[in-house]
Amino acid sequence: MHVALYGGSFDPPHNGHLALCLFAVELLRIDRLIISVSINPFKGRYGAADEQRKQMASLFAGELSRVGISAEVSGWELEKKQPSYTVDLIRYVRSVYPLDRLTLLIGEDSFREIRSWKSWEILPSLCDLAVFRRTSPEDHRENSSFPFSSGTVRLIDFDFPLSSTVIRERVAADMPVGDLLPSAIRHYIVKHGLYRKA
């Protein structure tokens, strides 16, 4: 079985996340997708509480399930109650799926900072890496800046210009976000009054 790990704060999950997951599952032939909710860097600044983000991630997984994608939400990082390291998360997932192929899905910006990660050198021995990069030519830099050989990492052109920050800002400004979010997540945000300025 091919298992993929997709982590983030998901504050909130949006259509860009959804599009990436749909694209990854089809392109990489992923059998199971794990959505890992990380510690929230925006806590106390209009960000949702940990449990709310986990619930929105569950709604997001439900959206994936509706189109036939097997998805589950992991709260392992949240349960640690402190910032965790990607290598530790991967080791945890590997312990749950010891015999399966494992791929880490990450964005290009995160990948270019990978040398600052704990034990980054051993990541290729634990999982495959799929790096989703912006498709505009001006955003592409020389592959020589990548810390691994070209055969270790799969580069995938993908561009969906949307961020959770934009959504939080639009909600705070009372601007519409209906076309940026799965409907279940939009309803959750409205119901719980998330991202509104005090």
From Swiss-Prot:
Pathway: Cofactor biosynthesis; NAD(+) biosynthesis; deamido-NAD(+) from nicotinate D-ribonucleotide: step 1/1. It is an enzyme of class 2 (transferase). GO terms for biological process: NAD biosynthetic process. InterPro entries: Cyt_trans-like, NadD/NMNAT, Rossmann-like_a/b/a_fold. It catalyses: nicotinate beta-D-ribonucleotide + ATP + H(+) = deamido-NAD(+) + diphosphate. Pfam families: CTP_transf_like. Keywords: ATP-binding, NAD, Nucleotide-binding, Nucleotidyltransferase, Pyridine nucleotide biosynthesis, Transferase. GO terms for molecular function: ATP binding; nicotinate-nucleotide adenylyltransferase activity. Its EC number is 2.7.7.18. PANTHER family: NICOTINATE-NUCLEOTIDE ADENYLYLTRANSFERASE-RELATED (PTHR39321), PHOSPHOPANTETHEINE ADENYLYLTRANSFERASE (PTHR39321:SF3). Belongs to the NadD family. Catalyzes the reversible adenylation of nicotinate mononucleotide (NaMN) to nicotinic acid adenine dinucleotide (NaAD). This is Probable nicotinate-nucleotide adenylyltransferase. It comes from Chlorobium limicola (strain DSM 245 / NBRC 103803 / 6330). The gene is nadD.
